[in-house]
Amino acid sequence: MKNYILLLLLAGQTAVAAAQDGDSRSLYLTRSLANDAITSAVVRTSAGGIVVSGQAGQAPRVEVYIKGNNGNELSKEEIKKRLDKDYTLDISVTGHEVKAIAKSKRQSFFNWRSSLSISFRIYVPQQCSTDLETSGGGIGLDNLKGNEKFSTSGGGLQIDRLNGVIRGNTSGGGIYVSNSGDDISLETSGGGIEAKNCNGKIRLETSGGGITLENLKGTINAETSGGGVNGNNITGELITSTSGGSIDLKRMAASVSAETSGGGLYAQMLKVGKYLKLQSSAGNVDIELPQNQGYDLDLRGEGVSPSSVAKFNGQWEKERVNGKYNGGGIPVKAEASGGSVNIKFR
């Protein structure tokens, strides 16, 4: 599973790296923002990447990286010639907002051999909001606090140390988010998602890759329609589903709702929150529960294992269990319509 997700992420992260490589050979110009006290950044480009960083110790500035669209290095004279003919490149500051805009002058298709890849790397104060769009490159953000909105139609998203309202989407690359929090919503229509060391309200969605969740705290909603879900060390509430892979959850201390229609489901609970609901229509459901909590059990499958447990009062049959464990309390529902339910108390 991890190798599969890594492969899905590589294309997106490689695209982000194109704007992050710091290759001085493609650095076309630098515009200082030292005297502008920037609090907002708006960036638009096509066939290029965008990076916005609030990293301490960096002088506020805009860097523009330009290459031939086939990756070839070009002289500044050749770049200027192509820019003047086919593009508009504008960097401006109004109030405390910087705008960096690169766009074609032509509405219709023109010779790709003469087209350019225009990427931006922008250093700003940490307290900065963003509005970023690119049609073909990756987007990277780090060390920012504010409202962050960003989208790309073909590259990856790489996010680290953001706090605020975070809204991002890509239509073909992977997503990696770490050390971030408050209110996160990220979506991709073709790559994997990996989220680590995040907190708050988190929504993650992909329509074609796997999801990895690690060291998360808060209310997490993670959905995929084509890969598996791996979760480790989650506190709070997790709602997750997949229509094409298995679900593997370890070291959970949360309320959990997990559903798969394409594989098995494993849930290791260190502590059950307000509820536990597990469902698989194509495999087994395996559960480990702490024995010091009380549960109202509702288990159904082609078989239920073991055949009985201590401290249980109710109906325990071969394919159905309904009753109270340890005096009852937290509702625990598990259903395996294509396999067995296997439960352990530890």
Q: What does each model-found stretch correspond to?
A:
Residues 1-346:
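Intrinsically disordered, low-complexity terminal regions
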